[in-house]
Amino acid sequence: MAAYTEDQLAEFQEAFNLFDNRGDGKIQLSQVGECLRALGQNPTESDVKKCTHQLKPDERISFEVFLPIYQAISKARSGDTADDFIEGLRHFDKDASGYISSAELRHLLTTLGEKLTDEEVEQLLANMEDQQGNINYEEFVRMVMSG
């Protein structure tokens, strides 16, 4: 297991405790993704399921069980870089202009991978379109990844 500082462990424990609604030192398995996101990770539901598939869906887990899940998600997601996402979107940039249509990006975000709702897409794309209805996908990726 990665060596975390006392401050990091205290931060992880504090976030974990916020999801412990019974005060028994455990959280619902269904809350693991939310807890990870509260700690700055951005796992997909698929990522969370891969790390928790051996646990029962209605199970409550302790911090000691949560910590290795956090580590696995942290390690797995650290490989995703802005350049990887930009490269993926570049395939949809037919004229190599640095732009893709907002309609095409909206379609990608609502149908592929971790599907977003229309409301989530609207929030992400707010103020990103130019007058022609296109989006600079490099700016978009950097904005999304910067939080």
Curated annotation (Swiss-Prot):
UniProt entry keywords in alphabetical sequence: Calcium, Metal-binding, Motor protein, Myosin, Phosphoprotein, Repeat
GO biological process entries: actin filament-based movement
InterPro entries: CALM/Myosin/TropC-like, EF-hand-dom_pair, EF_Hand_1_Ca_BS, EF_hand_dom
GO terms of molecular function: calcium ion binding; myosin binding; myosin heavy chain binding
Ranges of residues in domain EF-hand: 7-42, 80-115, 115-147
Superkingdom to which the source organism belongs: Eukaryota
Residue numbers binding Ca(2+): D93, D95, S97, Y99, E104
Keyword Calcium: yes
Modified residues (Phosphoserine): S30
Coiled-coil stretches: none
Positions of transmembrane segments: none
Cleaved signal peptide residues: none
SMART domains xref list: EFh
PROSITE patterns, sorted: EF_HAND_1 (PS00018), EF_HAND_2 (PS50222)
Gene Ontology, cellular component aspect: cytosol; myosin II complex; myosin V complex; myosin VI complex; myosin VII complex
Quaternary structure (record): Myosin is a hexamer of 2 heavy chains and 4 light chains.
Protein name per its UniProtKB record: Myosin-2 essential light chain
Protein species of origin: Drosophila melanogaster
Gene name of this polypeptide: Mlc-c
